[in-house]
Amino acid sequence: METKVHLPLAYQQQVFNELIEEDGLCVIAPGLSLLQIAANVLSYFAVPGSLLLLVGANVDDIELIQHEMESHLEKKLITVNTETMSVDKREKSYLEGGIFAITSRILVMDLLTKIIPTEKITGIVLLHADRVVSTGTVAFIMRLYRETNKTGFIKAFSDDPEQFLMGINALSHCLRCLFLRHVFIYPRFHVVVAESLEKSPANVVELNVNLSDSQKTIQSCLLTCIESTMRELRRLNSAYLDMEDWNIESALHRSFDVIVRRQLDSVWHRVSPKTKQLVGDLSTLKFLLSALVCYDCVSFLKLLDTLVLSVNVSSYPSNAQPSPWLMLDAANKMIRVARDRVYKESEGPNMDAIPILEEQPKWSVLQDVLNEVCHETMLADTDAETSNNSIMIMCADERTCLQLRDYLSTVTYDNKDSLKNMNSKLVDYFQWREQYRKMSKSIKKPEPSKEREASNTTSRKGVPPSKRRRVRGGNNATSRTTSDNTDANDSFSRDLRLEKILLSHLSKRYEPEVGNDAFEVIDDFNSIYIYSYNGERDELVLNNLRPRYVIMFDSDPNFIRRVEVYKATYPKRSLRVYFMYYGGSIEEQKYLFSVRREKDSFSRLIKERSNMAIVLTADSERFESQESKFLRNVNTRIAGGGQLSITNEKPRVIVDLREFRSSLPSILHGNNFSVIPCQLLVGDYILSPKICVERKSIRDLIQSLSNGRLYSQCEAMTEYYEIPVLLIEFEQHQSFTSPPFSDLSSEIGKNDVQSKLVLLTLSFPNLRIVWSSSAYVTSIIFQDLKAMEQEPDPASAASIGLEAGQDSTNTYNQAPLDLLMGLPYITMKNYRNVFYGGVKDIQEASETSERKWSELIGPEAGRRLYSFFRKQLKDYE
């Protein structure tokens, strides 16, 4: 049977042939049709009776691969999820064969429970291989797969080369996790790729747009603030941070603030509050840089006002201070210039204000381009089979799309400055300021005695004696924070007085009109499409739309490659690309930085591949001697009159299905535990007939203590198990500590986490609390806890907590179950009555009668829950 392949370009065919011949990892530049190649690989091996698995694909990936298969390859992709396919249906489908797109969590459970015949799997195609870690679910799947299937293939794909350079030997580590030896690297500068894309290049017109003078000033001020923040971080944390490559250019990296936070995670409990504030300020300043070229002048001013007004000292704790960058002269200058872009106060004795409403420079350039395209399209003949007159405008995000739609629907040919949509935004801005003013007045002011005391505290205790500076007149230096905040509030109040004057100007300047002067291109050509960049989906949009003109309002190197692939695939289609960017701006620097960084990443990746040691993918157990296996299985922890135990079986741990979202089951399996997935009603991990463990991350612990769920879980564990254990697990690379009592207030309240944990131990004296710094440490703790204990029975563990007549083989859909558990008067004890009482879904639960609710959860709880479902959303008086 001949297999159909749809790969029109030479580099696509070369990648396909290499992956067909050898298992390996393909690292390809983003925008070069990765999903199309993956779909053809799946189609090639999809012979009758084969079982192929697509792993690591998100919803968009599955949809695009399915479209490629159905439209060009005549194959079908089956999506596996718990909502559409039950366990029995999945088992039957696996036996029939086919191509299955399956989530890693479902696949690992099906492999452990033998629902899927591992030895019959033809192969696995993995997407986003750069996300694979040794403790993750994908690495767990590959270990289970290779334990019993030595002949099935593994093909992995990735379009993010930078991730393989994070850490030491990240590429070889990924290959080891995937049991692969070969790496196929295809950057944009690859000879075959370059030849394929340059045979039929698109007509590209670069439009270098100049920033306005006010935007240049604001950009310079923001860079000064970023530099000051980085310098302060370097000064405070030289022992913790790797600052070798720190400069303004490195701050342009899309994940720079995340990298800084990741370096500080392990010592986060030791750094000062000021350091934590500076890390957050980096994210804020980076966002302001992007907003400067994306937001209109009114929205940008509102964003700045929000930041300034949020630093009211009275809203901060006594030991906290506003962001340091807001105290800089550059920040004050930036705020003043941003306000001048919107309106200016006229000179003279009479207070007056003039609305400016500066438009973004790209807007007028976009209008000129559309005018040019409009006239050119009217005169040109179009072949409907090759292209049409549609115009495709690409933006960075949906906000910019909405902004352009508003602009194009209001601007006119005769008056480019007639931005009527800016009028409404300015009115909304003033209304927002008025609401803030009213809210500030409604807040209760502190009593005079407390206010005086606070003032004295600020002036006398705000600065240590050794740090006080002398000022003229012998007075103590006042805090700059207080004065700056007062000046900001005074300035805000002064600007509010100009509101009525500005509104009167606006009403005279922009009177509502009804006419046909609105941008006529939209009326004459209803084929102007405005989209935001959406990854691989942009290829599908280009193929379906077949535009004649593409206007890149915001720069994106990945989309440029997709346009190159589209033009090379269809060389007869007419295509012109307008590439707009702000010359000399951060936008241009970010674009050039991303292109240069990707090229450097591929170059380093090629060098690492040439120097990389050969990865051995053989089964490690083959080289393990019988003596070492014997010694490993001998339990040497003999105490309390115990006997020496020798077993050929691995230690067994029963794991709740929901726990497979975490990395602990994978680590347990890697440490020679036999992991058995099971639907547990009590506990998360069953170590023995006596020991039940409830695992909580820090975030889950806080939520469970707040809503009372942890109390119910401990109550259930205490009822059914002799040794209930609460495991509090921290992240591996984060600080292993809880907030010290010295950071708490003088009077610890009942809602503090420490107080709730104390109350929990008082309520359940038999409860054991185990603190673990990471999942690796948890695995070692489990080994110690299981010493001299019997192995648990899965059937018994699954039946614990069930009422008489209830079946333990039934499974839940987690999303509606979590919603059910969130309803009032539904507890850990009575929710099973709802599940087994004939309530099929949440809709039926909302329509259930009061009488039935009383039968399921009790008279009082049933009456209140019935009333809750019928409570009005709005509180009518």
Swiss-Prot record:
GO terms for molecular function: 3' overhang single-stranded DNA endodeoxyribonuclease activity; damaged DNA binding; single-stranded DNA binding; single-stranded DNA endodeoxyribonuclease activity. Residues 475-490 have a biased composition (Polar residues). Residues 652-732 form the ERCC4 domain. The modification Phosphoserine is found at residue 71. One of its GO terms (cellular component) is nucleotide-excision repair factor 1 complex. It comes from the Eukaryota. Its EC number is 3.1.-.-. One of its GO terms (biological process) is double-strand break repair via single-strand annealing. The keyword Cytoplasm applies. It is found in: Nucleus; Cytoplasm, Cytoskeleton, Microtubule organizing center, Spindle pole body. Keywords: Cytoplasm, Cytoskeleton, DNA damage, DNA repair, DNA-binding, Endonuclease, Hydrolase, Nuclease, Nucleus, Phosphoprotein. Endonuclease that specifically degrades single-stranded DNA and which is involved in nucleotide excision repair of DNA damaged with UV light, bulky adducts, or cross-linking agents. Required for double strand break-induced interchromosomal gene conversion. NCBIfam families: rad1. Heterodimer composed of rad16 and swi10. Belongs to the XPF family. This is DNA repair protein rad16. It comes from Schizosaccharomyces pombe (strain 972 / ATCC 24843) (Fission yeast).
